[in-house]
């Protein structure tokens, strides 16, 4: 990975953003959680933290007016931008043509809700070649987008996303923490996450009411001994579904013991097989322990009718 990114293109500043928005008749909307980055230094920092190089294929979700898009293209990478808002999706190629015309052939724009994206409707990512996600995600749907993309794209190898600071803290939280919860554990099924920096409110237009932070994620390799269960295998997802059911139940009643919270899913015998004390709470379990419990339930038979 490159340690530095050459500043070769014209990236968007505050005046550029406001002019583009005015020319296109676009206003940021709360519906889509739109806050546009107006600071070139911030988007270059995001791309640098992501380690993007010219050899990479990048997905961006929610490109907006193109601030981060241009910073990604500046590296020489090929990218696909997924934008839910039709006017913004229509405008983006023109912005790239205006500010970085040599990069237009490396950009594909898909007008689609990221929660509906699949390898079939975004064929650029349908093969086995690994790709990375780099995005300033809409705060209200950041976690669902990440978990959905990781489930549907086995070749999503890493991501660097900017999200609300509180969301970043939860995504990277460890067992035993007060903020450790469903997002933390489910993300840990796929790989490892860490918070790698904070972003102030003044780099956005309009300025949000919350601070932002960067989360970096690396997916487990298929042969990684740290990978829980069959997280990276070609199975039908049955084990993951059971693990996620356990997680949802355990954190849906956070203050209850595992025995109480999981009484309709996990028979008492399963705790013994997994070597897990049923008086513990879900917030103390690692993803490996949730997976061990799921395997134990499977070995006991039908986990739907726990006794």
Curated annotation (Swiss-Prot):
Chain sites annotated for binding S-adenosyl-L-methionine: 35, 37, 62, 83, 113, 136
> Which GO molecular function annotation, any one, does this entry have?
RNA binding
Which InterPro entries does this one have? KsgA/Erm (IPR001737), rRNA_Ade_diMease-like_C (IPR023165), rRNA_Ade_Mease_Trfase_CS (IPR020596), rRNA_Ade_methylase_Trfase_N (IPR020598), rRNA_adenine_dimethylase (IPR011530), SAM-dependent_MTases_sf (IPR029063)
Protein localization = Cytoplasm
Q: Reaction catalysed by this chain?
A: adenosine(1518)/adenosine(1519) in 16S rRNA + 4 S-adenosyl-L-methionine = N(6)-dimethyladenosine(1518)/N(6)-dimethyladenosine(1519) in 16S rRNA + 4 S-adenosyl-L-homocysteine + 4 H(+)
- Enzyme Commission number(s) of this protein: 2.1.1.182
The protein's matches in Pfam families, at most eight in alphabetical order, are given as:
RrnaAD (PF00398)
Keywords assigned:
Cytoplasm, Methyltransferase, RNA-binding, rRNA processing, S-adenosyl-L-methionine, Transferase
Tell me the superkingdom of the source.
Bacteria
**Functional note:** Specifically dimethylates two adjacent adenosines (A1518 and A1519) in the loop of a conserved hairpin near the 3'-end of 16S rRNA in the 30S particle. May play a critical role in biogenesis of 30S subunits.
Which protein are we looking at?
A: Ribosomal RNA small subunit methyltransferase A
| Taxonomic placement | Bacteria, Bacillati, Actinomycetota, Actinomycetes, Bifidobacteriales
Gene for this chain: rsmA
């Amino acid at each position: 990975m490159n340690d530095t990114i050459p500043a070769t293109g014209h990236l968007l500043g505050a005046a550029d953003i406001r002019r583009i928005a005015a020319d296109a008749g676009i206003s940021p909307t709360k519906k889509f959680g739109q806050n546009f980055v107006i600071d070139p230094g911030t988007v270059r920092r995001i791309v640098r933290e992501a380690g993007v190089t010219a050899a990479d294929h990048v997905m961006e979700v929610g490109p907006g007016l193109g601030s981060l898009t241009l910073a990604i293209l500046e590296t020489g990478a090929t990218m696909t931008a997924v934008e839910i808002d039709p006017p913004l999706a229509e405008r983006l190629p023109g912005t790239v043509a205006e500010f970085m015309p040599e990069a237009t052939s490396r950009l594909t724009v898909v007008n689609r809700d990221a929660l509906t994206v699949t390898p079939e409707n975004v064929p650029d990512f349908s093969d086995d070649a690994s790709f990375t996600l780099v995005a300033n995600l809409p705060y209200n749907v950041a976690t669902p987008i990440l978990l959905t993309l990781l489930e549907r794209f086995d070749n999503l190898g890493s991501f660097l996303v900017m999200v609300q600071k509180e969301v970043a803290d939860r995504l990277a939280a460890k067992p035993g923490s007060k903020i450790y919860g469903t997002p933390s554990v489910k993300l840990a099924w796929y790989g490892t996450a860490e918070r790698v920096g904070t972003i102030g409110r003044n780099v956005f237009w309009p300025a949000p009411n919350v601070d932002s932070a960067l989360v970096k994620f690396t997916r487990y390799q298929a042969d990684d001994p740290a990978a829980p269960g069959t997280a990276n295998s070609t199975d039908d997802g049955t084990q993951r579904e059971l693990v996620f059911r356990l997680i949802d139940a355990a954190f849906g009643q956070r203050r209850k013991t595992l025995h109480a919270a999981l009484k309709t899913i996990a028979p008492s015998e399963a705790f013994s097989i997994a070597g897990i004390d049923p008086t513990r709470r879900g917030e103390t379990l690692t993803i490996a322990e949730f997976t061990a419990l799921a395997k134990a339930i499977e070995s006991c038979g039908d986990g739907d009718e726990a006794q």
